[in-house]
């Protein structure tokens, strides 16, 4: 009897520790600024994210990436713009990625941390400790 109780406890503990139970960051996310919505997907072994819409895009669907520090990129439309790339790790934290911010045209080193099934924390840094953190909410 003791063996079956211990075996059951071990199975439950293993299931609770399983990465399969960790929240999946893929999906559509609401940003806290400018009504932005970003779709996070798997791109090979990494996570990437694309800007789907924002207040600026809703006002002008042809809004361009005018603040990009790379002049050759300024003609891109904001809709469909790659914002997140190269994040690896998991199951609850992904590091080593890049975050592009169309508001200032800068690209920053980033970390994505799942803080719940429907929330994540995105941290972008020029150089630590010069970082900014946002909490995003899952839409779907």
What do these predicted ranges mean?
Residues 1-5:
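Positively charged n-region of N-terminal signal peptides that target proteins for export
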Residues 25-26, 32-103, 107-108:
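Central antiparallel beta-sheet cores of small beta-barrel/beta-sandwich binding domains
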Residues 7-15:
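Bacterial N-terminal signal peptides
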Residues 18-22:
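Sec/Tat signal peptide C-region and signal peptidase I cleavage site
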Residues 139-140:
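Short, solvent-exposed mixed-charge patches
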Residues 104, 109-113, 119-133:
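Short, exposed beta-strand-loop hairpins at the edges of beta-sheets
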């Amino acid at each position: 009897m003791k063996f079956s109780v211990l075996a059951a406890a071990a199975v439950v503990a293993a299931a609770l520790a399983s990465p399969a139970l960790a929240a999946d960051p893929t999906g559509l996310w609401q940003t806290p600024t400018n009504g932005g919505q970003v779709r996070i997907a798997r791109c090979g072994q990494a996570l990437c994210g694309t800007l789907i819409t924002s207040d600026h895009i809703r006002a002008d669907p042809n809004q361009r990436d005018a603040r990009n520090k790379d002049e050759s990129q300024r003609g891109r439309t904001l809709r469909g713009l790659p914002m997140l790339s190269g994040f690896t790790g998991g199951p609850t934290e992904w590091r080593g990625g890049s975050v592009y911010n169309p508001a200032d045209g800068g690209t920053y080193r980033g970390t994505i941390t799942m803080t719940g099934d429907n929330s994540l924390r995105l941290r972008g840094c020029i150089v630590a400790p010069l970082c900014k953190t946002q909490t995003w909410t899952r839409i779907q």
